[in-house]
Amino acid sequence: MSFQAELVACFGQPVAENPTGAMQEAAFRAVGLDWRYLTVEVAPDALGDAVRGARAFGMRGFNLTIPHKVAVIEHLDEIAPEAAVIGAVNTVRRDAAGRLIGENTDGKGFLRGVRQDAGVDPKGLRAVVLGAGGAARAIVTELALAGVSQVLVVNRSHERGESLAADLSVKTATPIRFESWSGVYRVPADAGIFVNATSIGLFPAVDDMPAVDFADASSTLLVCDAVFNPPETRLLASARSRGLAVLDGLSMLVYQGVIGFELWTGLPAPEQVMKDALRKALSQSA
């Protein structure tokens, strides 16, 4: 018998409302692993100390959330190619030699949800992504690598939107173009996937909704929202009322966690257990 548990963690600020720990610990229990997931508030000027602590504790890995996804890179031994393209890390794994490797599972989690939950193959489709922050960078990168015909980045800030489009267009060899967002954005008829990669509609501002209009949208459009709390945002309700297929932010959160679990443990993740645990955690915090 051993009383020593393996450790993984989440470093961020703030983290009190981050439900990932409930999902991961349910998964550990389901497969019989004596592992613990620690949710730790880490200020920006303490991030280096936190990573050194993770090394000292022999942690199997850790997640990063706001504001550490970019700043953590200088403290790691290596980053995966996709994370290098995105320019951000949300998951770190410890390899057999004890080196800390940075990964980005946000975009991969989104893409797995598109394929598995929505049943859509993005290859050849035209994608529209609202926003130009970290989530948008990850989603645009993975859509480009999955073979979409074009990505349209729609953002209110010209500088951020143009920078993201220009940078990722070169890095992924995919046509990525910026379009300014002012007033109400009309989703074009030739779009196959629309993604809200902003935080508009996130709890507690559940009555907020991106200023978009689906009047011209194709009946085959898939509408996705990266906001996971609440799962049914006003944006998704609006799309659903028009008969459009939707994909909620829980899908992205679960699947990025599934990928992280598999990177840390080397075991297949109990996906349904993780989905159920996340829904339960969010319902209790509502």
Predicted features and spans:
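Glycine-rich adenosine-cofactor-binding loop
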Residues: 12, 104-107, 114-118, 123-145, ...
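Short glycine-rich anion-binding loops that position phosphate/pyrophosphate groups of nucleotides
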Residues: 60, 66-71, 134, 199-202, ...
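Adenosine-phosphate binding glycine-rich loop
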Residues: 124, 222, 226-286
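Residues at the starts of beta-strands that form the adenosine-phosphate
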Residues: 7, 36, 126, 149-151
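NAD(P)-binding Rossmann-fold cofactor-contacting core
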Residues: 146-171
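Phosphate/diphosphate ligand-binding glycine-rich loop within oxidoreductases
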Residues: 2-118
